[in-house]
From Swiss-Prot:
This is Large ribosomal subunit protein uL30. One of its GO terms (cellular component) is cytosolic large ribosomal subunit. SUPFAM superfamilies: Ribosomal protein L30p/L7e. GO terms for molecular function: structural constituent of ribosome. Keywords: Ribonucleoprotein, Ribosomal protein. Disulfide bonds: none annotated. One of its GO terms (biological process) is translation. Belongs to the universal ribosomal protein uL30 family. It comes from the Bacteria. Part of the 50S ribosomal subunit. InterPro entries: Ribo_uL30_ferredoxin-like_sf, Ribosomal_uL30_bac-type, Ribosomal_uL30_CS, Ribosomal_uL30_ferredoxin-like.
Length: 59
């Protein structure tokens, strides 16, 4: 599996509760915070839910 870098680029204020929980489950709390994860089908689905809030780069 490929590794990806996920960066929170926009605030979760005003978003739906399921989107907030998804951002938290990705390990992101503050704008600009970056986390690295292994790309899996589950992670791909989580990224799709919050694609307007995060920036994803393949490592």
């Amino acid at each position: 599996m490929a590794k990806v870098s996920i960066k929170l680029t926009k605030s979760v204020i005003g978003t739906k509760p399921n989107q907030r929980k998804t951002v938290e489950a990705l390990g992101l709390k503050k704008i600009g915070q970056v986390t690295e994860k292994e790309m899996t089908p589950q992670l791909r689905g989580m990224i799709d839910v919050v694609q307007h809030l995060v920036e994803v780069k393949e490592i």
